Design a protein with these regions (language model features):
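A cross-family phosphate/adenosyl-ligand binding-site feature
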Residues: 1-48, 53-116
Length: 116
């Protein structure tokens, strides 16, 4: 996973700490996690960051903006008000389901909205 020749097509880092966000933006590759992110960026593969630790500071948002401009998908673990989740498991399933959607992985973790 830490080499472009390994052939990873999609990478998700979730949860992604603010420290990891800053390191990814700065190009650090000093750990396996940072190296996997660096490889995804250099190979122009899909990279999704489930950034946590809100509220976000201006500096955090600038890191997210720059990474987004580089093609990274910023997908914080935030529950949508329309999800109608009534317990913690449903909330978790909604967030995980949204990440799986971004990865192109089918699932049935939450009920999809139906346009009647």
């Amino acid at each position: 996973v830490a080499s472009g020749s390994f052939g990873i097509e999609k990478t998700i880092i979730a949860p992604c700490s603010i420290s990891s966000l800053a390191k990814i933006h700065a190009g650090f590759a000093d750990t396996l996690l940072m190296r996997a992110a660096a490889v995804a960026l250099k190979e122009r593969k899909k990279l999704i960051l489930g950034v946590r630790e809100m509220p976000f500071s201006t500096l955090n948002l600038e890191h997210m903006l720059k990474l987004s401009q580089m093609g990274v998908i910023i997908a914080p673990p935030i529950i949508a008000s329309y999800s109608h989740a009534s317990n913690l498991e449903q909330m978790e399933n909604f967030i995980i389901g949204k990440w799986l959607d971004l990865l192109g992985i089918s699932h049935n973790l939450y009920e999809r909205w139906q346009n009647f």
